[in-house]
Amino acid sequence: MEEPAPPRSRSQRTADTLERLRGDVDLWVASASADGEAYLVPLSYHWDGSTLTIATPTASPTARNLLRAGRVRAALGQTRDVVIVEGTVEAFPIGADLELEDAHASSTGFDPRTLRDEYVYLRITPQ
């Protein structure tokens, strides 16, 4: 068995995290209903350098749970090098920020504006 790598310095961990946020496309979003039922879903995201933006159907458990709680826990990366993001959630409807919506569509390859179902964008601000 290969010897595990030594721990990275704080500056190296920060650099690696920022690189993953810039380079990855998908993350796992965890939420819970008001009665504590856990819900986990993969979603594509856009990283603008300080916030993550995801889009999900307005009627989905994810949207309901995150909008009720106002907080999120998300994970991205490989199991042995996972990045956990905890943050606050702010919703904005389609059409509210066209520049960000275009950036989300460009970086994720997914544009909810073209779909029939009603979607909401959720901006995650890491804490």
Task: Name the predicted role of every residue range.
Residues E2-W28:
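Short, basic/aromatic recognition patches
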Residues M1-Q12, T79-Q127:
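Charged, gly/pro-rich active-site loop segments
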Residues P57-A59, P126-Q127:
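Secondary-structure transition/turn motif
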Residues D24-T58, R64-L66, V72-L76, I84-V85:
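Short beta-strand segments
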Residues E19, D35, R64, G77-T79, ...:
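Generic marker of residues within folded, mature protein domains
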Residues R13-D16, L40-V41, A59, G109:
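A generic local structural motif
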Residues T17, V25, S50, D81, ...:
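A generic secondary-structure signal marking the coil-to-beta-strand transition
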